């Protein structure tokens, strides 16, 4: 990360700090690599952002000594929805409105990047990137992703290990159920199998090069396996547009090193 940021001519990095585990680990990595003076974290809350997410983000930013700002996105989202109201008339609310939130955050981070000469770090893990649990031109906007080849279950292990070296991530961030917080009471498990199951399937399919049938024969639920395999295959177009990052597995996506 430090080598790439320096060679690319950026003064430092900026990332969205959501109060979740992925951005928390990414922030810790950025500070370890660059020092707190070269890292900016931005909390961009909306209606669905939990109070504890705001508290945890602020606590971690203070813990690591980085520049921290809060930029609510309600005015941006409402402006977009007002512009789109006629076009969306007669349609039901769906992931379109959720993605607007993510894309508003991407716009803010890129504006900070342009103004301050900071590279935007994205924070999606390999489990999310594999199944497309990310928003194109939203939380995928950026120049580098330190954890793009790290499965979600590994993210937790890395976070716990990092805290054994020195406190860097609030314990509550590690213990809370993961959520994108783009809808009321949303949890990742609403859309995906539990990460223990998801990662086991992904490891078999991607790293193990196993067929869906072979994975099912290993004892996994057929519906889960076929859903995951379909998502992995369908979402290649998203992964092709993701920023580069560090490769840590034999089957990293893209041509990262």
Summary of predicted features, one role per range:
Residues 1-18, 23-257:
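ATP/NTP-dependent adenylation/nucleotidyl-transfer catalytic domains that generate, transfer
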């Amino acid at each position: 990360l430090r080598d790439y940021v320096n060679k690319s001519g950026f003064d430092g990095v900026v990332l969205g700090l959501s109060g979740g585990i992925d951005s928390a680990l990414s922030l810790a990595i950025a500070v370890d690599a660059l020092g707190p003076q070269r890292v900016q974290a931005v909390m961009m809350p909306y209606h669905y952002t939990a109070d504890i997410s705001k508290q945890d983000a602020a606590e971690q930013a203070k813990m690591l000594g980085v520049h921290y700002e809060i930029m609510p996105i309600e005015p941006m989202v409402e402006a977009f929805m007002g512009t789109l109201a006629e076009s969306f008339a007669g349609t039901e609310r769906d992931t379109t409105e959720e993605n607007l939130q993510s894309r508003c955050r991407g716009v803010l981070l890129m504006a900070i990047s342009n103004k301050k000469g900071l590279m935007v770090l994205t924070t999606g893990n390999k489990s999310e990137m594999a199944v497309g649990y990310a928003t194109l031109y939203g939380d995928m906007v950026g120049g580098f992703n330190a954890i793009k080849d790290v499965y979600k279950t590994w993210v937790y292990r890395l976070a716990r290990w990092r805290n054994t070296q020195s406190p860097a991530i609030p314990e509550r961030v590690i213990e809370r159920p993961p959520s994108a917080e783009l809808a009321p009471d949303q949890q990742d498990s609403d859309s995906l199998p539990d990460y223990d199951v998801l990662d086991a399937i992904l490891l078999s399919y991607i790293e193990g090069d196993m067929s869906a049938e072979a994975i099912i024969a290993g004892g996994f639920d057929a519906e889960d396996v076929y859903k995951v395999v379909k998502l992995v295959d369908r979402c290649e177009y998203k992964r092709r547009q993701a920023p580069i990052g560090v490769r840590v597995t034999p089957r990293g996506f893209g041509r990262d090193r």
